[in-house]
């Protein structure tokens, strides 16, 4: 908005009005109050004065170049799965040219705004980087806490095990000591008993006996001492073995813990589990020299003979530290994970240039012995790593396996166990992929990708335009032939109903009418049952519903459906009881039926106005409009006008000359010619806008229906239309929606293939009627497809091969030839090439303009595909009077026709005592010796039955014929 006085200019400059008045007076512009008008010349004088007062000179044009550099890091995984850090540097260069013309003030303002936008973008990126860094820090903190918790639990478990082991060893030592003491005591007691016995037997032995006894006592003491020493040695040996086992277990646990830490630590920093003691620095070796056949011996090869000797305690040193020392390069700075790959990149000569790590042409005697594995011979058991896998809406099998850090074959095996055969490149839907992730023991999270549609939601919340009153959108709904369009025509003073094929509405008509009390927008919906989706769209976009009910017909099925649509949308209903000019009209009955459906008139204490009208004479039309506008006032309908437009697609079609054309209802904002619009998967610039009368218009405000041209494709009816400032952003969102829809659709189809195959196997033989449907508008095509699919039965099924909007082309005929389909054109025609191709290939093309006719003819075609029904008709009764046995012929019955007529081609049932004993065919029918075609009632004949000779006198033959009767749906 231009600033026309001092106060507005001060507000624009964000400074007090008094200060601005002082500056104006100093510049020679005489302004006394804040309401004085300002001209462009006054502003120019003020600008010159300010420049001079601040020391600005009128020199040549100058320019300033600003260069901004922003450096960041990103982590990218390569094909092997290793993460690499990549430095990203973003450089921005902007040049500002200083001009002296007053007319360039606006351009400078725009440059400042652009710079502010760049600053805001930079701040936003910095904020995102900070958030990402905080998230990474939080994840690292959680990882550290989890690792500390695991180590704490491991230490507690180890302490408990050590305490139990010490207690067990102490108990064993005590038991061994007790056993040794008991053995010594027993030996001593035995010796004493023997000595006592000897003394008792011979109290006066000689000195020789005493010497022998002393020797025996010494031997016993020696034996007791040896037993005690043996027990002590056994206890010490057991204690040493337990200590050795404990040391080995601790070493294995330390090794496993170091491996876990190395695997869980981020790749940019290699964590060393145990820091080995630094050896003394050796003297700098001389420069290694070698020839082509005998390369220089690396440092690792010098210590090879010593490495072959067994170590004193191989498990005492943790594996990662030892492996790191073994694989370390002379200038090493990288961990052992990448050393092998670096060594393999060297030129392979005939000598072992890798120091024995990788076998070259000379690997040792007969390929043995020289190679020594980097990994430790002890493989400690590690607990499985549970990963959080973010699963997008669609993901291939290979990508899913990569996210879980497993081979794709493992995923394929799991899918096979679940009963689904997949390939490595097959796309899975989100639900199936999450089941697979959970099956493999990981946590599955539904991922939210970088959805460009999120920007649309952010843009919606930021709209703060002024809300102004808008016209109401009124939808006319009701049963077919109840007079909706005729009522609307009387209001519009036009004749539309006569122009619709068959006199019924088959499109949504959108019109706006100017009444003395304001503008009203009307939506006329079809009443035929096939147009349920159209009526639902009409109720979605409306503010008030006019429910038209014929006074002579009452509440019908589509009337009930319209009531349910209005109630589902929470839309107030105004009931118009039409055709009151007819003699059989009964408005009271209509009211009672509507009360039963939950629509209570105001006179009964409800909230729905009931207005009796006549679309033929015009009676009650003014009262109807009065009630509609009264409801609109109660609703206080408002919408922003000075804002980007938003609306809904009411109808869409493909015009041969104009391309995709969409009828949309603007719900808020103002739509102008040249705006960039996005409608579902379609986008484009509005090249032309027409009102409902076909006249060009430049803009359309809230609640105004318009027809727009310039979209990239035909949008689906009911899609939301939104105006975007940038065509690039519109294209990005449209392509994102297309890819998302296509991927999800393919994944769902793939998941349903096996189930559909099993269904078809169980159903057996089912007849299919393939159809290709081309219609003039999206709504008609949708309604026709739904109506035809409802005709499917268990025996005959309608198969819609393809349905689209537009004329019938050669590609449609080619598709019909390949699928053996019938082409149905609804208000469309085939071009010359398509007609010629259809005649050459024998393709049937049917044209319709009334939906009744299309449904009826398809129903008749399906009836013709049904298997005919077989019916039996009894034509006569025959009584057996005499039986003859004829050689080489069999049994022949002499019969009398008692009722009806017997034909040679008829079937027969043999009745004995009124019980059927055989059903078959006549083999011969003779009268005297002549073969005859038929025998009438009251005549005798001879008959023989095929494959049946057990005929007795008194039997009866029931003669019948089988006829086929065509079935109907």
UniProtKB/Swiss-Prot annotation:
Keyword GTP-binding: yes
Positions of the UniProt region annotated as G5: 614-616
Gly residues composition-biased segments: 353-366
Region named G3: 524-527
G1: annotated span: 478-485
Molecular function terms, GO-annotated: GTP binding; GTPase activity; guanosine tetraphosphate binding; translation initiation factor activity
Superkingdom field: Bacteria
Pfam family, one: IF2_N
Binding site for GTP: 478-485, 524-528, 578-581
Record CDD domains: IF2_eIF5B, IF2_mtIF2_II, mtIF2_IVc
Compositionally biased intervals (Low complexity): 105-114, 182-206, 301-323
InterPro entries per UniProt: DNA-bd_dom_put_sf, EF-G-like_DII, EFTu-like_2, IF2_assoc_dom_bac, IF2_II, IF2_N, P-loop_NTPase, Small_GTP-bd
Bias-annotated ranges (Basic and acidic residues): 49-63, 143-181, 209-260
Subcellular location(s) per record: Cytoplasm
Keyword set includes GTP-binding: yes
tr-type G domain boundaries: 469-638
UniProt-annotated stretches for the region Disordered: 49-85, 100-128, 143-380
UniProt region (G4), positions on chain: 578-581
GO CC term, one of those recorded: cytosol
Record keywords, A-Z: Cytoplasm, GTP-binding, Initiation factor, Nucleotide-binding, Protein biosynthesis
The protein's role, per its UniProt record: One of the essential components for the initiation of protein synthesis. Protects formylmethionyl-tRNA from spontaneous hydrolysis and promotes its binding to the 30S ribosomal subunits. Also involved in the hydrolysis of GTP during the formation of the 70S ribosomal complex.
Family indicated by similarity: Belongs to the TRAFAC class translation factor GTPase superfamily. Classic translation factor GTPase family. IF-2 subfamily.
NCBIfam families: IF-2, small_GTP
Protein's recorded name: Translation initiation factor IF-2
Source species: Burkholderia multivorans (strain ATCC 17616 / 249)
Gene transcribed to yield this protein: infB
């Amino acid at each position: 908005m231009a600033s026309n006085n001092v106060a507005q200019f001060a507000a624009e400059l964000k400074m007090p009005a008094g200060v601005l008045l002082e500056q104006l007076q100093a510049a020679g512009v005489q302004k006394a109050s804040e309401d004085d008008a300002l001209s462009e010349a006054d502003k120019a004088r003020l600008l010159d004065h300010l420049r001079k007062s601040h020391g600005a000179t009128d020199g040549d044009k100058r320019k300033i170049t600003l260069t901004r550099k922003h450096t960041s890091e990103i982590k990218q995984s390569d094909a092997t799965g290793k993460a690499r850090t990549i430095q990203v540097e973003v450089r921005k260069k902007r040049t500002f040219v200083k001009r002296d013309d007053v007319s360039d003030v606006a351009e400078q303002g725009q440059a400042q705004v652009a710079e502010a936008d760049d600053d805001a973008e930079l701040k936003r990126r910095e904020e995102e980087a900070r958030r990402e860094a905080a998230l990474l820090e939080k994840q690292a903190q959680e990882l550290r806490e989890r690792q500390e918790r695991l180590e704490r639990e491991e230490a507690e478990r180890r302490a408990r095990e050590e305490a139990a082991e010490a207690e067990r060893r102490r108990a064993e030592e005590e038991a061994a000591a007790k056993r040794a003491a008991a053995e010594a005591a027993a030996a001593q007691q035995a010796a004493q008993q023997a000595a006592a016995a000897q003394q008792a037997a011979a109290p006066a032995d000689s000195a020789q006996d005493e010497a022998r006894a002393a020797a025996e006592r010494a031997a016993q003491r020696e034996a007791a001492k040896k037993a005690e020493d043996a027990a002590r040695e056994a206890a010490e040996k057991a204690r040493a073995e337990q200590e050795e086992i404990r040391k080995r277990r601790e070493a294995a646990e330390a090794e496993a813990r170091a491996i876990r830490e190395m695997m869980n630590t981020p790749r940019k920093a290699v964590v060393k589990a145990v820091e080995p003691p630094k050896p003394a620095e050796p003297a700098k070796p001389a420069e290694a020299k070698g020839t082509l056949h005998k390369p220089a011996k690396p440092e690792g090869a010098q210590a090879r003979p010593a490495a072959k000797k067994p170590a004193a305690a191989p498990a005492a040193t943790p594996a990662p530290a030892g492996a790191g020392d073994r694989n370390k390069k002379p200038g090493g700075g990288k961990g052992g994970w990448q050393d092998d790959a670096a060594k393999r990149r060297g030129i392979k000569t005939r000598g072992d240039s890798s120091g024995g790590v990788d076998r070259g042409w000379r690997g040792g005697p007969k390929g043995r012995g020289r190679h020594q594995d980097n990994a430790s011979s002890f493989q400690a058991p590690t607990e499985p790593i549970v990963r959080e896998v973010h699963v997008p809406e669609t993901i291939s099998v290979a990508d899913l396996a990569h996210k879980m850090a497993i081979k794709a074959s493992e995923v394929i095996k799991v899918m096979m166990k679940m009963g689904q055969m997949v390939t490595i490149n097959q796309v899975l839907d989100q639900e199936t992929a999450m089941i697979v992730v959970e099956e493999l023991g990981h946590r599955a999270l539904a991922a939210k990708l970088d959805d460009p549609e999120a920007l649309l939601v952010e843009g919606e919340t930021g709209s703060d335009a002024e809300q102004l009153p808008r016209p109401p959108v009124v939808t006319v709904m009701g049963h077919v032939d109840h007079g909706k369009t005729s009522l609307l025509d009387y209001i519009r003073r036009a004749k539309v109903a006569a122009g619709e094929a068959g006199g019924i509405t088959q499109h949504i008509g959108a019109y706006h009418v100017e009444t003395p009390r304001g503008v009203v927008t009307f939506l006329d919906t079809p009443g035929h049952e096939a147009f349920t989706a159209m009526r639902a769209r009409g109720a979605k976009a409306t503010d008030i519903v006019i429910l038209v009910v014929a006074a002579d017909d009452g509440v019908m099925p589509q009337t009930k459906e319209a009531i349910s649509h209005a109630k589902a949308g929470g839309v107030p209903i105004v009931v118009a009881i039409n055709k009151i000019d007819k003699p059989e009209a009964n408005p009271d009955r209509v009211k009672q039926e509507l009360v039963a459906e939950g629509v209570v008139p105001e006179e009964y204490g409800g909230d729905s106005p009931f207005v009796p009208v006549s679309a033929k004479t015009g009676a009650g039309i003014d009262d109807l409009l009065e009630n509609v506008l009264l409801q609109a006032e109660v609703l206080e309908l408002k919408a922003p006008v000075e804002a980007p437009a938003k609306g809904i697609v009411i109808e869409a079609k493909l015009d041969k000359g104009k391309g995709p054309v969409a009828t949309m209802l603007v719900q808020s904002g103002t739509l102008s010619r040249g705006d960039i619009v996005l409608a579902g998967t379609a986008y484009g610039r509005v090249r032309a806008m027409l009102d409902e009368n076909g006249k060009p218009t430049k803009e359309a405000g809230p609640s105004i229906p318009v027809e727009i041209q310039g979209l990239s494709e035909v949008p689906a009816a009911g899609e939301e239309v939104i105006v975007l400032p940038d065509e690039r952003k519109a294209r990005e969102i449209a392509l994102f929606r297309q890819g998302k829809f296509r991927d999800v659709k393919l994944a769902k189809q793939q998941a349903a293939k096996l189930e559909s195959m099993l269904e078809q196997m169980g159903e057996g033989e089912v007849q299919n009627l393939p159809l290709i449907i081309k219609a003039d508008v999206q709504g008609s095509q949708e309604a026709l497809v739904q109506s035809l699919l409802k005709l499917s039965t268990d025996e005959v099924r309608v198969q819609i091969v393809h349905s689209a909007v537009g004329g019938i082309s050669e590609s449609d005929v080619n598709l019909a030839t390949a699928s053996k389909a019938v082409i149905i054109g609804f208000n469309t025609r085939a071009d010359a090439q398509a007609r010629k191709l259809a005649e050459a290939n024998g393709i049937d093309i049917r044209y319709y303009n009334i939906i009744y006719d299309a449904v009826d003819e398809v129903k008749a075609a399906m009836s013709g595909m049904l298997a005919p029904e077989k019916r039996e008709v009894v034509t006569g009764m025959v009584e057996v009077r005499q039986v003859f046995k004829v050689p080489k012929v069999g049994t022949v019955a002499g019969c009398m026709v008692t009722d009806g007529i017997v034909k040679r081609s008829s079937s027969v049932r043999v009745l004995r005592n009124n019980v059927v004993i055989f059903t078959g065919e006549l083999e011969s029918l003779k009268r005297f010796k002549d073969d005859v075609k038929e025998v009438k009632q009251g005549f005798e004949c001879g008959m023989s039955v095929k494959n049946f000779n057990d005929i007795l006198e008194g039997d009866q033959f029931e003669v019948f014929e089988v006829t086929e009767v065509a079935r109907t749906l």
